[in-house]
Regions:
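Active-site beta-strand/loop signature of hydrolases that rely on acidic residues for catalysis
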Residues: 3-8, 17-40, 62, 97, ...
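Acidic/histidine-rich helix-loop elements
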Residues: 3-11, 80-88, 119-121
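Structured beta-strand-rich core segments of catalytic domains in phosphoester-bond hydrolases
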Residues: 28-109, 113, 198, 205-207
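Active-site-proximal segments of metal-dependent phosphoesterases and phosphodiesterases across multiple
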Residues: 112-132, 155-164, 172
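Short glycine-/acidic-enriched loop or helix-start segments at secondary-structure transitions
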Residues: 14-15, 38-42, 46, 122, ...
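Glycine-rich, phosphate-binding/catalytic loops in enzymes
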Residues: 20-23, 41-48, 127-129, 162-166
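Metal-dependent phosphoester-hydrolase catalytic domains
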Residues: 72, 137-143, 151-251
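Structural motif corresponding to alpha-helix initiation and N-cap regions
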Residues: 11-15, 56, 186
Length: 251
C-alpha cells in the first residue's frame, strides 16, 4: 500500500492535493493542519473517511474506495501542552480509520497524527505517541497499524525509536529531511510508526507551499512477506529435490 502524509501549513497547500494524488497514486492520504470545515468529499480517486471536528485546522484521512472499505473512523484528544491550554489550537491530535483491505481480504488501521509543537517537551510528545498507540490498539485489537504525521520530533529520534519499540511499534524515517522553515529546526519532523507492517520505503516528496514536505510511505503486511518467503523456500527445496533426481535439467 502507498500512503501519503502531508502537513498543509494552515491549509495553504490544500491546492496541491489533487496533483499529488494523480502523480503518486496513493491508496491513502493523511492530512494535518487542513481546513476541516471546507474539506472536499473527494481528492482525485480518494474518498474522505472523516476529519476532526473540534478544531478548524485539524486532521483528515482519505482512502481509495475500490481498494478499501471503511469500518469505523474515530478522533482522539491527547494530553495537552501548555501551548494547547493557552492558544487552544488543537483539541484532537489523532484520527484513525479501521479499514477492510478488499485486495488482501483483511483489516488494518491507519492514523493521521499531529504532535504538540516544539514549545512542548519531547517527554510530552512521547506521552502523546504512546497514548495514540494505545488508542489505536483499542480501535483495531491485534490489527496491522500505521500511524503517520507530524511528530514534531527532530532530535533524539533514537530514544523515540527505543520507546516505540518497547510497545511493539517500529519507527521509520524518510530518506531526506521533511522540514526546512527554521534554520535550527530542520530535519525529520514527519515520521511513520507501524506494527504488523513491513515499511519498505519512506520517501520525502518535493516541497510545495507548506513548510513541511509530504512523505510517501510504502508498506506491506509483515506476515504476507513471511508467507512469500516460506513459499519461495518451499519452491527452492522442491527445485533441489528435482535437480537431484534428474541430472539432465534444473528447475
Amino acid at each position: 500500500m502507498r500512503v501519503i502524509s502531508y502537513n498543509l501549513r494552515k491549509n495553504r497547500a490544500s491546492g496541491e492535493l489533487v496533483a499529488l494524488a494523480e502523480r503518486y497514486s496513493p491508496n491513502i492520504l493523511c492530512l494535518q493542519e487542513c481546513n476541516t470545515i471546507d474539506l472536499p468529499a473527494e481528492v482525485g480517486n480518494l474518498h474522505l473517511a472523516d476529519s476532526t471536528r473540534r478544531n478548524r485546522l485539524g486532521l483528515a484521512i482519505y482512502y481509495n474506495k475500490d481498494r478499501f472499505t471503511a469500518v469505523k473512523t474515530q478522533a482522539f484528544a491527547l494530553k495537552k501542552s501548555l501551548h494547547d491550554h493557552l492558544a487552544a489550537p488543537a483539541h484532537e491530535r489523532l484520527i484513525a480509520t479501521r479499514l477492510v483491505d478488499n485486495v488482501a481480504h483483511r483489516e488494518f488501521v491507519v492514523a493521521s497524527f499531529h504532535a504538540a509543537p516544539l514549545t512542548a517537551l519531547n517527554s510530552l510528545r512521547r506521552n502523546q505517541i504512546r497514548t495514540a498507540h494505545e488508542e489505536l490498539s483499542l480501535l483495531g485489537p491485534g490489527l496491522p497499524t500505521l500511524m503517520v504525521g507530524d511528530y514534531n520530533y527532530p532530535i533524539f529520534q533514537g530514544k523515540l525509536g527505543n520507546k516505540v519499540n518497547q510497545s511493539g511499534y517500529d519507527l521509520t524515517l524518510s530518506d531526506t529531511r521533511t522540514y526546512t522553515r527554521y534554520k535550527f529546526f530542520r530535519g525529520h519532523f514527519d515520521l511513520a510508526t507501524s506494527m504488523g507492517l513491513m515499511v519498505s520505503n519512506v520517501e520525502t516528496l518535493p516541497q510545495g507551499t507548506s513548510d513541511h514536505m509530504p512523505i510517501l510511505v510504502t508498506a506491506t503486511y509483515s506476515d504476507e512477506n513471511k508467507m512469500q518467503t516460506d513459499a519461495a523456500q518451499h519452491g527452492a527445496h522442491r527445485s533441489e529435490s528435482v535437480s537431484a533426481e534428474g541430472a539432465d535439467f534444473i528447475i
